[in-house]
Curated annotation (Swiss-Prot):
Record localization: Cytoplasm
Quaternary structure, from the entry: Acetyl-CoA carboxylase is a heterohexamer composed of biotin carboxyl carrier protein (AccB), biotin carboxylase (AccC) and two subunits each of ACCase subunit alpha (AccA) and ACCase subunit beta (AccD).
Role this protein plays: Component of the acetyl coenzyme A carboxylase (ACC) complex. First, biotin carboxylase catalyzes the carboxylation of biotin on its carrier protein (BCCP) and then the CO(2) group is transferred by the carboxyltransferase to acetyl-CoA to form malonyl-CoA.
One Pfam family cited in the UniProt record for this chain: ACCA
UniProt organism field: Pseudomonas entomophila (strain L48)
Gene (UniProt): accA
Keywords noted in UniProt: ATP-binding, Cytoplasm, Fatty acid biosynthesis, Fatty acid metabolism, Lipid biosynthesis, Lipid metabolism, Nucleotide-binding, Transferase
The protein's Enzyme Commission number: 2.1.3.15
Catalyzed chemical reaction(s): N(6)-carboxybiotinyl-L-lysyl-[protein] + acetyl-CoA = N(6)-biotinyl-L-lysyl-[protein] + malonyl-CoA
Protein name stated in the entry: Acetyl-coenzyme A carboxylase carboxyl transferase subunit alpha
PANTHER family attached to this UniProt entry: ACETYL-COENZYME A CARBOXYLASE CARBOXYL TRANSFERASE SUBUNIT ALPHA, ACETYL-COENZYME A CARBOXYLASE CARBOXYL TRANSFERASE SUBUNIT ALPHA, CHLOROPLASTIC
Family: Belongs to the AccA family.
Length: 315
């Protein structure tokens, strides 16, 4: 199976394979088969629209985890200029599962922080599969407090299965690190915009997710537990993950209807990984617009607005 396509996309993958075969035949024999290729491309687009217009919550969860999906550093490369990565929590070590640093957006200084997964095996291990340890969250907190001192807005990118649950993380007080970030972010006197770009897994996501504006990409997810984890608890088997995903309401559109998410950012046809540059352009445009709006608020109004937003959850 083509790794660029998930199983429910297999009909699209088959058409793309035919298109590639025709291109190779045309190159080898100098034949003009552009009309047939164009016909198949139109058919592929129509089929993609049909499949992606009827995705289940579980299919969206799998898209959010797609191995080709853009990660935080990909968005930083496309959206910002003059990015300077900063390292370490000044307590224990540096955590590669969290990246952050200063940058410019539309020529204005900002602090960018996000979860980072890896592509290849060694990189995945180095990034701990996007699951931060306490030092990652403490690094993020250090950078956010720095941003407040220098009056820089904070932009976070959320993409994690969850905080790392290992013994070493618990020994260094994982829960305290997350809780401290929630406390600090609620009081920071600078605008905060969080964008869920893939998986928004529980407290591991929320630790950089307290904000004035919460965006979610169209095929991202945000939940207190993974569908597999929920299914294992409720039905004693991960095979019920699809049912759990539907019941939990983990998708951007569902969370927007509950007023938890402020903006759903549309993805290119087939998902963000089909056109990362276009996806980044969409995110960039929204961030600029939202920063302009939040930048007009004084600190008291900003904090009151943030408090009211958080207190409105569940009402």
């Amino acid at each position: 199976m083509n790794p660029n396509f998930l199983d429910f996309e297999q009909p699209i993958a088959d058409l793309q394979a035919k298109i590639e075969e025709l291109r190779l035949v045309g190159n080898d024999n100098s034949l003009n088969i552009s009309d047939e290729i164009a016909r198949l491309q139109d058919k592929s687009s129509t089929l993609t629209e049909s499949i992606f217009g009827n995705l289940t919550s579980w299919q969206i969860a799998r898209l959010a985890r797609h191995p080709r999906r853009p990660y935080t550093l990909d968005y930083i490369e496309h959206i910002f200029t003059e990015f300077e990565e900063l390292h370490g929590d000044r307590h224990f070590s540096d955590d590669a599962a969290i990246v952050g640093g200063t940058a410019r957006l539309n020529d204005k200084p900002v602090m960018v922080i996000g979860h980072q997964k890896g592509r290849e095996v060694r990189e995945k291990v180095r990034r701990n599969f996007g699951m931060p340890r306490p030092e990652g969250y403490r690094k993020a907190c250090r950078l956010m407090e720095m941003a407040e001192r220098f009056k820089m807005p904070i932009l976070t990118f959320i993409d994690t299965p969850g905080a790392y649950p290992g013994i070493d993380a618990e020994e260094r007080n994982q829960s305290e690190a997350i809780a401290w970030n929630l406390r600090v972010m609620a009081r920071l006197k600078t605008p905060i915009i969080a964008t869920v770009i893939g998986e928004g897994g529980s407290g591991g996501a929320l630790a950089i997710g307290v904000c004035d504006q919460l965006n979610m990409l169209q095929y991202s997810t945000y939940s207190v537990i993974s569908p597999e984890g929920c299914a294992s608890i409720l039905w004693k088997t991960a095979d019920k993950a699809a049912d759990a995903a539907e019941a939990m309401g983990i998708t951007a559109e569902r969370l927007k209807s509950l007023n938890i998410v402020d903006k759903v950012i549309q993805e290119p046809l087939g998902g963000a990984h089909r056109d990362p540059a276009k996806m980044a352009a969409n995110v960039r445009a929204d961030l600029i617009e939202q920063l302009d709006m939040l930048g007009k608020l004084d600190n008291d109004t900003l904090l009151k607005r943030r408090y009211d937003r958080l207190m409105s959850y569940g009402i």
